[in-house]
């Protein structure tokens, strides 16, 4: 890197990679244009920079363009001359942004990043603790650099006294010194190769894991130094580079003061101390003073590089810490995130938005003033081309005066020139869309109501920004890709996002309602026109039931056409809507009461059958109709619309009576405090539900008299209609308005037991108001926290997935995931049809008869998934991003359908970012609160049996049963399920069956709706014996491991097992029930968990299926279930839960009770020959779910607890793990009613599995047990396979999204995410190369990103490069793709020898540049 760096043209095409490494003193000097010797900045009288100071013009270049400091040389003609008076080179002033200087340090100084950024690189390299290195550096201790023949050891620390003593004893036979010089000498003296050999030997021989790990770390570091060409002594600086002055400016402000960058202060401290040290050394000052000065110099450089990293931060005059070089690049305000990833853009404006109900979907209203400002350059050029102005200056004046012709020209300029509208926060790609502007008066931007959902905008003062795409390419992209009419479907779920809401829904609902006995009822009309005429003349009512003759053509999704003919029963309103229904859609879609869901269905159907264009037109027409009729309906909220039910008071009195009884029971100690609270909560929630129900009854029905006869009809109450249609409000809100408010939650989620009996119409008393403030405030606080958290989750997701792009058509794998319907609580929540839509099959789908229904590789569309459903297929194998074999990207087949476009995804689509946005965007809707089970949150009555909801057959899965003496079948397995399938064999229900349940029917039996297929005790889990024999109680000692309780009322005795923590002695006793035969041989032993209540006495006789003990379920209930946003973050961060379930690491037999320690119990897993394969130590408080002698398979649960995703992946495999994350994440979103396609979650999971751990290094350079990018292992294996060597064996490792982002191959991407210092430190030592593959890296260096149209451009230029290389073409020759070559198109007079042109071109370019610079552009 020489001075040429400054004069080269920064052409972004010229480099393919960026490398970061340590700079040697020679390199730093080669960057520099001179040494900065003085701390002065500028002369305060003349405002000229001081010579040799921090702003010296001689070093850094002139202050004014092409003018030396003393003014002897001015103008362009002297370019390149160095003035002999002031020594300044005549050059452009902008070189002051790029020319660096340097400071020669009198003594070496350690770079703080390599010292303090953990793990300390210098400490690790020298194999010294950080504390010791610091002692040497900051002149507290001496370090022996060369022990000579003395008994001292190398790197031994000596205090001043010890050093003096050693000098006395050994004289100058040894060398010891302090400060950075000593460290530098030690670093330089290290023989890296021999150290590496020693460490490799140590790794192989060492028995202790800790030693081995440390050796591996050190070995890695030494190897990187060896491989990267960095010298370790470069971590200690002898020359300090000085930043160009224009990057640390000093600006005069009024009042004769200066605003300066903190860096100048920091540099001045360094220079001052450096100069003082130089003087002290020249004067031969006493050692202690020199030492102190050296320490201060070290501290000054530390502060410059990273202020506050060590000791107290250096503060400026205003007591705040100075901003060092490290602070400049890190954090949200740092260089990476503020200036490189997010730049401000020109040609943009922002204003408040208002509603534009008369716009078409692809239009937006743009205020005239704003448009004129935005399109100024276009207007100028049109004014000149049209001959209205001769110069730009004149055009400028015309625009300023706003002459009439300007507006006409603006109209033509704006025509078909799309603009981008953006609303912050832009949470997903639909937050920026393109519209065609329509000029409007006023100052607010008008927005089409249907795109509000995508922008999440409303008109209560929201602002939006407008951006103008300038180039033809960008206009084309805006029109084709970003136009609102091309973004009908949401990329997250594939459902329409432009569905009508609020007023529109209300209007459509209102006119499609029917009313008994309305004017004109029963009339027959022959066409829409007749109805319209009759309605307009006032002879029929809009809600009247009529008959209408129709004759339409209808298309279905398979492309068939059929006729819809005949007379239909309908209403006037629905007939009026017939006019806007396009040809091809059935009238039956409209011929019903249109609530929000139904309107969505119409739009969905239109898109599937008629395509985008017709859908957009339909949506617009529906919107106009909705607005028109909601205005005409006159629906509004009045206080009388809130009907309070008559029986409210009675219900409340009844509840208060019950509560009084319960309180009395509590006072006479019949029930516990907990029971009292739960009962009261139950009473109030039941009462408020009942009051709500009778309020709904009153509000939803009206009594009218038709022909003197009274009739009940559905009400036209405004509040009811708003809620019923889905326009605004909900049942719950109506209940609070006119029923009773009910129970309020405290901030911790528990309910306050005094319910609010009033409603908002009656008004709340002061006390009631106070009670309700609790929950309301929690809501507000939550919302504020939630938004920040959701934003941060999105950022982490985007960062981990940003470089995942579809880069090829097909990777050719037949791997995939098994998909079946998602079943929760026995109900099918997501049918297979929905999950399979838009996926590619990984294996043939075969019917029960063995017929291949669909072949592998088929992309499933709507018609094909219906085919699956019709044939009763309930499980298929689909390709998935997780199992895709494409490296550094994805293939289109594994991803499947692009949800927003309804066809296979294009190569170049950045699916990673789309996935991150789809998961992050609904994050703000997810609740923050953790759901509490128990108390009022789970008000459901406890379930104790299962009734079938569909007729069909039942099938047992993993169920073992025994028959007890009453002849009942008792379930003795833990994770059993009963599956109910219909007559076609499709799974319709799936129920988990607890241990101890009674199953009346056998597997394979037919069932009808309502049949009970299992019953159990909901309050306790029984321990059941599957052998008969005599009971022997072991370690059940009254007062130590168990406690006897005697109930006075019932006279019952119970024995309950106490917990280990309650015992004072005998902590290693383990209560067990053993069952023995007549000879006393043990048949079975059942360990008793804490809280178990014994059902048997010692020596009693048991039959098969008898209950040995019961564990009350109150105690073993789950802890709080984390819900909402924290749960999603927990899943993607792959956090290990506390007290996670312990899974069996291998197959074998469980052996318990051997060699238990004081605190821990030992589980041994033995193979067939009785050898111990695995041992697991667990705290004694953990409850085991396996018995001694039980056979287990790899991945079976040994001790229960929440699932640990890491163990799941390790022991159960990729598919189980993927399934777990998918189902868990989806259940959180489903709870909030958010639809997200599975493939987005799979895409993120793929990025969490980027690394693998080496099990066997084979013939590679890798080391066993280190974790490496999977791609690198696969590439290495390819090489080894070709050479016929032994391949690497590895196992996938799970990483959370934050760790995964930080350990990406690209250091630019990682550094701009988090922990910038650590990432750059590591990268520079490794001399890391960034291949600029991802999106982020390319944004940083200002290139087109390699995705979408950018990928096409990149591929094209790569092709051209390759052709150039093959043909040996020079850079300045131009050629095009010859396939599109047409000789007739060439005009021969334009062709000249390029060589001659080159010189002329340069001259023209030169004069042009100067001309432009003289103009004030």
Curated annotation (Swiss-Prot):
Enzyme Commission number(s): 2.7.7.6
GO BP terms: DNA-templated transcription
Cofactor note (record): Binds 1 Mg(2+) ion per subunit. Binds 2 Zn(2+) ions per subunit.
Gene Ontology MF terms: DNA binding; DNA-directed RNA polymerase activity; magnesium ion binding; zinc ion binding
SUPFAM superfamilies reported for this sequence: beta and beta-prime subunits of DNA dependent RNA-polymerase
Keywords: DNA-directed RNA polymerase, Magnesium, Metal-binding, Nucleotidyltransferase, Transcription, Transferase, Zinc
Cofactor(s) required, per the database record: Mg(2+); Zn(2+)
Catalytic activity: RNA(n) + a ribonucleoside 5'-triphosphate = RNA(n+1) + diphosphate
Cross-referenced InterPro entries: DNA-dir_RpoC_beta_prime (IPR045867), DNA-dir_RpoC_beta_prime_bact (IPR012754), RNA_pol_asu (IPR000722), RNA_pol_N (IPR006592), RNA_pol_Rpb1_1 (IPR007080), RNA_pol_Rpb1_3 (IPR007066), RNA_pol_Rpb1_3_sf (IPR042102), RNA_pol_Rpb1_4 (IPR007083)
Entry's Gene Ontology cellular component terms: DNA-directed RNA polymerase complex
Sequence positions that bind Mg(2+): 458, 460, 462
SMART domains the record matches: RPOLA_N
Binding, Zn(2+) 1: 68, 70, 83, 86
Domain of life: Bacteria
Binding residue positions for Zn(2+) 2: 811, 884, 891, 894
Keyword flag Endoplasmic reticulum: no
Biological role stated in the UniProt entry: DNA-dependent RNA polymerase catalyzes the transcription of DNA into RNA using the four ribonucleoside triphosphates as substrates.
Protein family (similarity comment): Belongs to the RNA polymerase beta' chain family.
PANTHER family for this protein: DNA-DIRECTED RNA POLYMERASE, DNA-DIRECTED RNA POLYMERASE SUBUNIT BETA
Quaternary organization: The RNAP catalytic core consists of 2 alpha, 1 beta, 1 beta' and 1 omega subunit. When a sigma factor is associated with the core the holoenzyme is formed, which can initiate transcription.
Identification of the protein by name: DNA-directed RNA polymerase subunit beta'
Record organism: Francisella tularensis subsp. tularensis (strain SCHU S4 / Schu 4)
């Amino acid at each position: 890197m020489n001075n040429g760096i400054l004069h080269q043209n920064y052409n972004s095409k010229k480099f393919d990679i960026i490398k970061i490494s340590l700079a040697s003193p020679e390199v730093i000097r080669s960057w520099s244009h001179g040494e900065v010797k003085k701390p002065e900045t500028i002369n305060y009288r003349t405002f000229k920079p001081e010579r040799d100071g921090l702003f010296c013009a001689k070093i850094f270049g002139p202050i004014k363009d092409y003018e030396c400091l003393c003014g002897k040389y001015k103008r362009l003609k002297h370019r390149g001359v160095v003035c002999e008076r002031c020594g300044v080179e005549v050059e452009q002033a902008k070189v002051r942004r790029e020319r660096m200087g340097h400071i020669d340090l009198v003594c070496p100084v350690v770079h703080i990043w390599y010292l303090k950024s953990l793990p300390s690189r210098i400490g690790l390299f020298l194999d010294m603790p950080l504390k010791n290195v610091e002692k040497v550096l900051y002149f507290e201790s001496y370090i022996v650099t060369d022990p000579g023949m003395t008994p001292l050891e190398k790197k031994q620390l000596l205090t001043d006294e010890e050093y003096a003593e050693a000098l006395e004893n050994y004289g100058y036979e040894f060398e010891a010194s302090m400060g950075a010089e000593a460290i530098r000498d030690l670093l330089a003296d290290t023989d890296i190769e021999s150290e590496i050999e020693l460490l490799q030997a140590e790794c192989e021989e060492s028995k202790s894991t800790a030693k081995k790990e440390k050796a591996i770390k050190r070995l890695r570091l030494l190897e990187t130094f060896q491989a990267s060409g960095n010298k370790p002594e470069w971590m200690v600086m002898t020359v300090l580079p000085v930043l160009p002055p224009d990057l640390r400016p000093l600006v005069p402000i009024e009042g004769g003061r200066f605003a300066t960058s903190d860096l100048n202060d920091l540099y001045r401290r360094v220079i001052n101390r450096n100069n003082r040290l130089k003087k002290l050394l020249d004067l031969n000052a006493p050692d202690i003073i020199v030492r102190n000065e050296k320490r201060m110099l070290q501290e000054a450089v530390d502060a410059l590089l990273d202020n506050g990293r060590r000791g107290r931060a250096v503060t400026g005059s205003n007591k705040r810490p100075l901003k060092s070089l490290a602070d400049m690049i890190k954090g949200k305000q740092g260089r990476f995130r503020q200036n490189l990833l997010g730049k401000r853009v020109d040609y943009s404006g922002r204003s408040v938005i208002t509603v534009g109900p008369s716009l078409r979907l692809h239009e937006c209203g743009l205020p005239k003033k704003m448009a004129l400002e935005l399109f100024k350059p276009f207007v100028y050029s049109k004014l000149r081309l049209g001959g209205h102005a001769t110069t730009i200056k004149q055009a400028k004046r015309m625009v300023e005066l706003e002459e009439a012709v300007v507006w006409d020209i603006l109209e033509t300029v704006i025509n078909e020139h799309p603009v981008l509208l953006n609303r912050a926060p832009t949470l997903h790609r639909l937050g920026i869309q393109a519209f065609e502007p329509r000029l409007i008066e006023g100052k607010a931007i008008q927005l089409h109501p249907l795109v509000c959902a995508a922008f999440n905008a409303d008109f209560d003062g929201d602002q939006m920004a407008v951006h103008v795409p300038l180039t033809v390419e960008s206009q084309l992209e805006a029109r084709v890709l970003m136009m609102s009419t091309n973004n009908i479907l949401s990329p997250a779920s594939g459902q329409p996002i432009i569905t009508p809401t609020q007023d529109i829904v209300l209007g459509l609902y209102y006119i499609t309602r029917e009313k008994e006995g309305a004017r004109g009822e029963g009339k027959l009309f022959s066409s829409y026109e007749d109805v319209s005429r009759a309605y307009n003349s006032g002879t029929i009512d809009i809600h009247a039931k009529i008959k209408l003759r129709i004759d339409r053509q209808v298309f279905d999704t398979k492309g068939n056409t059929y006729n819809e003919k005949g007379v239909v029963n309908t209403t006037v309103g629905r007939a009026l809507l017939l006019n806007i229904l396009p040809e091809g859609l059935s009238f039956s879609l409209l011929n019903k009461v249109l609530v929000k869901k139904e309107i969505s269905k119409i739009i969905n159907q239109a898109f599937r059958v008629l395509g985008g264009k017709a859908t957009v037109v339909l949506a617009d027409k529906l919107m106009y109709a909705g607005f028109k009729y909601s205005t005409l309906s006159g629906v509004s909220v009045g206080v009388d619309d809130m009907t309070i039910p008559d029986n409210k008071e009675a219900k409340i009195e009844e509840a208060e009576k019950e509560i009084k009884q319960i309180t009395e029971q509590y006072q006479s100690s019949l029930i516990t405090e907990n029971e009292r609270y739960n009962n009261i909560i139950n009473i109030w929630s039941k009462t408020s539900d009942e009051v709500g129900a009778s309020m709904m009854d009153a509000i939803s029905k009206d009594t009218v008299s038709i022909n003197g006869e009274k009739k009940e009809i559905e009400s036209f109450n405004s509040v009811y209609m708003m809620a019923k249609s889905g326009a605004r409000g909900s049942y719950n809100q109506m209940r609070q308005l006119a029923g009773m408010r009910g129970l309020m939650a405290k901030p911790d989620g528990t309910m306050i037991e005094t319910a609010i009996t009033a409603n908002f119409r009656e008004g709340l008393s002061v006390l009631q108001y106070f009670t309700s403030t609790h929950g309301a405030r929690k809501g507000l606080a939550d919302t504020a926290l939630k938004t920040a958290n959701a934003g941060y989750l999105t950022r982490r997701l985007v960062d981990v997935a940003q470089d995942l792009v579809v880069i090829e058509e097909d990777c050719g794998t037949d791997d995939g995931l098994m998909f079946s319907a998602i079943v929760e609580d026995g109900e099918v929540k997501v049918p297979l049809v929905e999950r399979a839509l838009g996926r590619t099959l990984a294996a043939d789908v075969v019917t029960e008869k063995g017929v291949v229904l669909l072949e592998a590789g088929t992309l499933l569309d709507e018609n094909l998934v219906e085919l699956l459903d019709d044939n009763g297929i309930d499980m298929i194998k689909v390709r998935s991003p997780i199992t895709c074999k494409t490296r550094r990207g994805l293939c289109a087949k594994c991803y499947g359908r692009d949800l927003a476009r309804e066809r296979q995804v294009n190569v170049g689509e950045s699916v990673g970012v789309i996935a991150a946005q789809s998961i992050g965007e609904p994050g703000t809707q997810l609740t923050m609160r953790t759901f509490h089970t128990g108390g009022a949150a789970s008000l459901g009555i406890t379930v104790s049996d299962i009734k079938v909801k569909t007729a069909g057959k039942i099938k047992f899965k993993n169920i073992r049963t025994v028959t007890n003496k009453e002849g009942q079948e008792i379930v003795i397995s833990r994770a059993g399920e009963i599956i109910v399938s219909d007559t076609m064999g499709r799974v319709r229900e799936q129920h988990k069956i607890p241990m101890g349940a009674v199953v009346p029917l056998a597997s394979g039996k037919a069932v009808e709706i309502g049949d009970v297929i299992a019953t159990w005790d909901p309050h306790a889990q029984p321990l059941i014996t599957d052998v008969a024999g005599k009971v022997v109680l072991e370690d059940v000692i009254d007062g130590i491991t168990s406690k006897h309780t005697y109930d006075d009322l019932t006279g019952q005795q119970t024995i309950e097992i106490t917990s280990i923590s309650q015992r004072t002695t005998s902590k290693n006793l383990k209560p067990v029930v053993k069952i023995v035969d007549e000879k006393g041989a043990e048949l079975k032993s059942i360990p008793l968990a804490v809280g178990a209540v014994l059902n048997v006495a010692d020596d009693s006789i048991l039959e098969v299926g008898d209950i040995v003990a019961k564990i009350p379920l109150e105690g073993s209930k789950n802890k709080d279930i984390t819900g909402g946003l924290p749960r999603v973050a927990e899943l993607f961060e792959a956090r290990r839960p506390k007290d996670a379930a312990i899974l069996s690491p291998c197959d074998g037999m469980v052996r318990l009770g051997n060699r238990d320690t004081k605190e821990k119990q030992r589980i041994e897993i033995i193979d067939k020959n009785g050898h111990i394969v695995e041992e697991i130590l667990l705290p004694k408080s953990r409850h085991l779910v396996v018995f001694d002698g039980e056979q287990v398979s790899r991945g079976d649960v040994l001790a229960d607890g929440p699932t640990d995703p890491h163990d799941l992946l390790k022991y159960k495999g990729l598919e189980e793990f993927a399934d777990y994350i998918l189902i868990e994440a989806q259940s959180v979103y489903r709870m909030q009613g958010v639809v997200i396609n599975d493939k987005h979650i799979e895409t993120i999971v793929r990025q969490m599995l980027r690394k693998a751990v080496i099990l066997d290094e084979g013939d590679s350079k890798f080391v066993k047990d280190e974790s490496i990018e999977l791609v690198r292992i696969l590439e290495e294996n390819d090489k080894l396979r070709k050479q016929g060597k032994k391949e690497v064996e590895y196992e996938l490792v799970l990483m959370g999204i934050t760790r995964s982002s930080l350990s990406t191959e690209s250091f630019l991407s990682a550094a701009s995410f988090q922990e910038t210092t650590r990432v750059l430190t590591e990268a520079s030592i490794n001399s890391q190369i960034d291949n600029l593959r991802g999106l982020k890296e390319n944004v940083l260096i200002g290139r087109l990103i390699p995705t979408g149209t950018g990928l096409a451009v990149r591929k094209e230029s790569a092709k051209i490069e390759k052709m150039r290389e093959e043909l040996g073409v020079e850079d300045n020759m131009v050629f095009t793709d010859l396939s599109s070559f047409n000789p007739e198109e060439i005009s021969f007079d334009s062709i000249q020898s390029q060589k001659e042109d080159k010189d002329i071109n340069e001259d023209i370019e030169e004069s042009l540049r100067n001309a432009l610079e003289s103009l004030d552009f």
